[in-house]
C-alpha cells in the first residue's frame, strides 16, 4: 500500500491587537435582549445578502470581487471578501448602526414595560460553553467583546472571525467569558509569531495556526511533550546492544550499498497511517506501536493497526497519559505477550480505562528490540525499517506547516516520534539566487493528519545523516519480529 501524500499549503492567519470591555447584564431582560439581537443580526445579514445578490451580475466590475469566479461567490467567499475590503467593513458598520439604533429604541420600550431602572445598554457578546442556562451570561462578568465599537470592529473583525472559525473547526469550549478572553489573547500572540516567522524568507519551513493556537507553550509542553528521560535497562533480556546491531544489520544489508540522499518507507508500503494521541501524553506509545506496525508491514506484508490504548493502560513501567519511555514500552509489550488490534482495544485518549489484556484472542508481538547507534540512523532506517526515536521539541514545533524544519530546538528530550525516511531537496537561496541541496529526515508524528505535512515533518540533516538536529535519535529503537 502506498502512503505517499501530496501536501497542500493553507492560508496563514494574520494578527492584530484585541480590546475587551466590561458590561453588566441584567438577567430579567436577557431573554428579550437575546431575541432582539438574533432578529437584528439576521436582518443585517439579510440586507447584506440582498444587496450582494442584487449587484451580482456586475460583480466583475467591482474591486471587491476582482479575480473571483462565479463558483467562488458563495457565503463564505462573500463574507471574507467583505472583511478584506475597507468599503465592505464600512458597509457592515453602517448596517450595524442602523440595527443598533432600532435595538436601542426597542430596549427603551422593554425597560419601560419592565419598570427596570437599573438596566444598561447591552454592548457585548460572549463566546463560551453553554452547558448551563445560567452560563449564557454571568452577572458582573468581565471581558465581553465590544462588537458595536467602530474602531474595535474595523480593527478586529477579521481576527474575531478567525477566532470564531478556530473555535468552530476545533470544537473548542470555554467555561467563562474570562477564559475565552485569555484564550483569544493567546491565539493572537501565536498568530503574531506565525506571521513573523513566515515573513522570514531565509527559513526553510512555514508555520500555520492549528488546534494548538489557544495554548501557551507551557500548556502545550505539559500536555503533549511527556517523554521521560531514557534510562538504559540493566540486564534486560530483550534489548540488543551495539554488538548485536552489527549482526542484525549484516543479516538484512549484507554487502549492499545504499543511496544516502533519499529513501522513504511511505513509498514502499512500510508506514501505517498517522494517528492522533489527542489530549493524552502518550507519544511514547504511538512511537513504539507505529514501529511495530511498520515491521509487520515490511516483514509480513500485513497492514495492521495496533492498540496504543492497551499500552497506555497496561504498560506498568510507564505512566499512561503522563508520559513514558520508548524502551519501557517495548519491554512491557513483550511481557504482555503482544498487543491487540485497535478494533479490539480502541483508543479513548485521556478517559479513565483499566487494563484488560483479555480483550482479544489474537495478539501481535515482538521478539526483542534493537538499540540503534546514533551514527547509523540512515543505514538502520534503510535496511531495518522505521525507527522509534526521541527528540527535543521547542515552541517552533507545534505550528509547523510544511518545508524543512530548521527552527529552534528544545533544551531536553521531550517527545517520541518515528523516523520513516530521509530525502534531499534543492532550494534556491534568495540571496545568491543559486540552488542549494538540503537534506532532511522524515518524521511521523502523532498529532493527527491535519498537523504539518499530513501528519509528517521534515527535519534538516546532512547527507551522511550524522547531523541530528534537536537531539534526534539520541534514543533510537527498532522492534524485531523475526
Swiss-Prot record:
GO terms for cellular component: extracellular space; food vacuole; lysosome; membrane. GO terms for molecular function: cysteine-type endopeptidase activity. It is a single-pass type II membrane protein. Residues 1-35 are cytoplasmic. A motif (Bipartite vacuolar targeting signal 2) lies at residues 84-105. GO terms for biological process: proteolysis involved in protein catabolic process. Glycans are attached at residues 67, 117. Keywords: Disulfide bond, Glycoprotein, Hydrolase, Membrane, Protease, Signal-anchor, Thiol protease, Transmembrane, Transmembrane helix, Vacuole, Zymogen. Component of the hemozoin formation complex (HFC) composed of falcipains FP2A and/or FP2B, plasmepsins PMII, PMIII/HAP and PMIV, heme detoxifying protein HDP and falcilysin FLN. The HFC complex is involved in hemoglobin degradation and detoxification of heme in the food vacuole during the asexual blood stage. Cysteine protease which cleaves native host hemoglobin in the food vacuole during the asexual blood stage. Preferentially cleaves substrates which have a leucine at the P2 position. This is Falcipain-2b.
